[in-house]
Amino acid sequence: MTILLVGLGAALGAILRYQLTRIGNHIASEFPLMTFLINLTGSFCLGWLTGSQLSQPVTLFLGVGVLGGYTTFSTLNSELSQLWFRRRYHIFFGYWLLTYGLGLLVAAAGFYAGL
């Protein structure tokens, strides 16, 4: 049952991320805005979920499943690599610092909101 909960959640999270990315593709920018926003909202939600201390099945479905499928560490690092190799260093460092710096802050804010 646990595997099914996680798998269904991951599918829902991935579909949500895909749809949001499609919607945001019309924004012409070198800055990967949709990945940035997806990862920040996912960080906040996971922080909230952790602070809420919900039941294990709910946490597995939402945290490991939905938010695991929704957020994307691999896309973040792929985009960072592309920016670096295209010599877009100012965007690279801004994206890197904002994602990790704000990611920690919004996760902490989510945690405290969930208490």
Swiss-Prot record:
The keyword Transmembrane helix applies. Na(+) binds at residues 68, 71. It is found in: Cell membrane. Na(+) is not transported, but it plays an essential structural role and its presence is essential for fluoride channel function. It catalyses: fluoride(in) = fluoride(out). GO terms for biological process: cellular detoxification of fluoride. It comes from the Bacteria. The chain crosses the membrane at residues 1-21, 31-51, 57-77, 91-111. The keyword Cell membrane applies. GO terms for molecular function: fluoride channel activity; metal ion binding. GO terms for cellular component: plasma membrane. It is a multi-pass membrane protein. Keywords: Cell membrane, Ion channel, Ion transport, Membrane, Metal-binding, Sodium, Transmembrane, Transmembrane helix, Transport. Belongs to the fluoride channel Fluc/FEX (TC 1.A.43) family. Fluoride-specific ion channel. Important for reducing fluoride concentration in the cell, thus reducing its toxicity. This is Fluoride-specific ion channel FluC 2. It comes from Latilactobacillus sakei subsp. sakei (strain 23K).
